[in-house]
Amino acid sequence: MLNTARLDNPAVIFDNGSGLCKVGISGEIVPRHVINSVVGHPKFNIPSARSNRKRYFVGEEAQCMYDGLYLHYPIERGLVTRWDDMEKLWKDLFEWELGVKPNEQPVFMTEPSLNPRETREKTTEIMFEKFNVPALYLCNHAVGALCASACITGLVLDSGDGVTCTVPIYEGYSLPRAITKLYVAGRDITEHLTRLLLAKGYTFPCILNKAVVDDIKEKLCTVSWGSKDSEKCYQRSLSEYKLPDGNTIQMSDHLCQVPEVLFTPEHLGIHDLGISKMVCNSIMKCDTDIQENLFAEIVLSGGTTLFPGLQDRLLKELEVLAFEGTPIKITASPDRCYSAWIGGSVMTSLTTFKQMWVTAEDFKEYGAFVVQRKCF
């Protein structure tokens, strides 16, 4: 029998991403822990006290020991591809980061748009069979982000490490047929910046360290407002970046060039729509009755939307693409890298959410397929 009292315990909120996993407790403002979505397996015996307690390492710990580890990334382009490592990552987050017992608290977990049925059911099986959670809910990442903005209807432009997507949402439910995806996101921008730096002759060994290039990207890269502004943007953004080894990089046109791939993915040889046209394309696939509402509530989500100038550039291009006179509003929360997690924290704090849980009793009676019936 299900101990219903456990459903009253604060839920554990997971936001699983290709680059980062965020975890915390329902009702809190931001995640307690944010770790890199990486699991490291020793190449040989590592003389470490910590190696006695576990045979793998996760997050920053794994990255710091990368010379002696085989690094695995369990989530690729938003989808789980290595289930054994994903289970290890969840176990570490439960036990070592949060210090909670999985069988004592319900679990709310975000999932990518258009998540395959097999992935949803596998997640459900692991949570109930391996971790014995009392209840589970899988929520579309974009729905969580919109909830964090206190809205139930709108369009979410979400861009993280592995994928960028536009998701129209009506009264709390995503509209799958109108979702548009672009496989250009944070990691692609980092890789593009690395290539540009190498082409300029920066061959310092440490420059190949992804963390260093990520830091350059996050601190110095911007989005220009268009080709006419590019030269001014390059001049304005001329800057130096000091590498860990003491050398410096003179940054100039890289700053405006790199995030441009979100608007013109052709720069990477990818012949898909850029984010401005993606927004319009998704909205135009929806019923005409709600299109104006969607244009009036566009929400940015994910760390890759944090580039200075991105919101202004997007608005400028949408004003050209949309019908003349269409009211357009873009919401860009300063905490939008945590939007989906925050939305989950808000949703699970509502007294009405209790009826939404897929309980252990539901799983026992109907199997993993029950997640298709209760989480949509």
UniProtKB/Swiss-Prot annotation:
Subcellular location: Cytoplasm, Cytoskeleton; Cytoplasm; Nucleus; Cytoplasmic vesicle, Secretory vesicle, Acrosome
Cellular-component GO terms for this entry: acrosomal vesicle; actin cytoskeleton; cytoplasm; nucleus
Pfam families named among the record's database cross-references: Actin (PF00022)
Gene3D superfamilies documented for this protein: 3.30.420.40, Actin, Chain A, domain 4
Protein's UniProt keywords contain Oxidoreductase: no
PANTHER family for this protein: ACTIN
Name of the protein: Actin-related protein T1
Naturally occurring in which organism (per UniProt): Rattus norvegicus
